[in-house]
């Protein structure tokens, strides 16, 4: 008695790789004074969102983190959100 499944074999799900929002022709520049842009990359608790969620490249993630920290130091962004 051989066991055969009636369900077809499923192909593994392949998620399309996200592209960096800061690379490209008309991509926004990372600037510590651009608070509206920086707030998109901060969680509701005030933490910097990791690049695996935002799909920012490694180089641009470092620039983004530096800009967020600089804006926090100057008082443009809060360190923590209550």
Curated annotation (Swiss-Prot):
The alphabetical list of record keywords is: Ribonucleoprotein, Ribosomal protein, RNA-binding, rRNA-binding
Q: Name one GO biological process term.
A: translation
Among its keywords, does the record have RNA-binding? yes
Region labeled Disordered — which residues?
1-20
Q: Name one GO molecular function term.
A: small ribosomal subunit rRNA binding
Per the record, GO CC terms?
cytosolic small ribosomal subunit
Q: What does this protein do?
A: Binds as a heterodimer with protein bS6 to the central domain of the 16S rRNA, where it helps stabilize the platform of the 30S subunit.
The entry's family comment says: Belongs to the bacterial ribosomal protein bS18 family.
Oligomeric form and interacting partners: Part of the 30S ribosomal subunit. Forms a tight heterodimer with protein bS6.
Q: Which NCBIfam families match?
A: S18 (TIGR00165)
Its protein name is Small ribosomal subunit protein bS18
Which species does the entry assign this protein to?
Answer: Rhizobium leguminosarum bv. trifolii (strain WSM2304)
Gene symbol? Answer: rpsR
